[in-house]
A protein has these predicted regions:
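Canonical pleckstrin homology
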Residues: 54-82
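Phosphoinositide-binding peripheral membrane targeting modules
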Residues: 12-16, 23-64
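Anionic N-terminal interaction surfaces
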Residues: 1-24, 41-42, 71-77, 87-93, ...
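Short, solvent-exposed aromatic-acidic interface loops
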Residues: 34-35, 82-85
Length: 103
């Protein structure tokens, strides 16, 4: 299981910080926002319709391009990596591969 230090933003939500784990069935985000207690959010790979790198201003997190997931339920989930920029493309490629397996 791979793990990444990330920022993420769900549709109509504020940015959260924490970690992302690539589990066998989907993504597992664990983190917090401000003083709110930590929470876990899961996204099954089958819910991911498209993966891309978001370069536009409104797609960035922390001023950097993000990995953008177009979700079947509607909306986009943005993932910003705290690690080196090269990891962003690796994560996008891995998520594309994992989400394609569910088709």
């Amino acid at each position: 299981m791979s793990s990444y230090a990330v920022l993420w933003s769900e549709p109509r939500q504020e940015v959260e910080t924490g970690k992302l784990e690539l589990e066998p069935a989907g993504l597992r985000f664990e983190g917090s926002r401000g003083r709110r207690p930590a929470r876990v959010h899961r996204v099954p790979y089958g819910e991911i319709e498209h993966v891309r790198i978001g370069h536009r201003i409104q797609e960035r997190l922390g001023g950097r391009p993000s990995v953008v997931l177009d979700l079947a339920a509607g909306g986009r989930l943005r993932i910003g990596l705290v690690d080196a920029p090269g990891v962003r493309s690796e994560l996008a490629d891995e998520l594309t591969r994992l989400s394609a397996k569910t088709d």
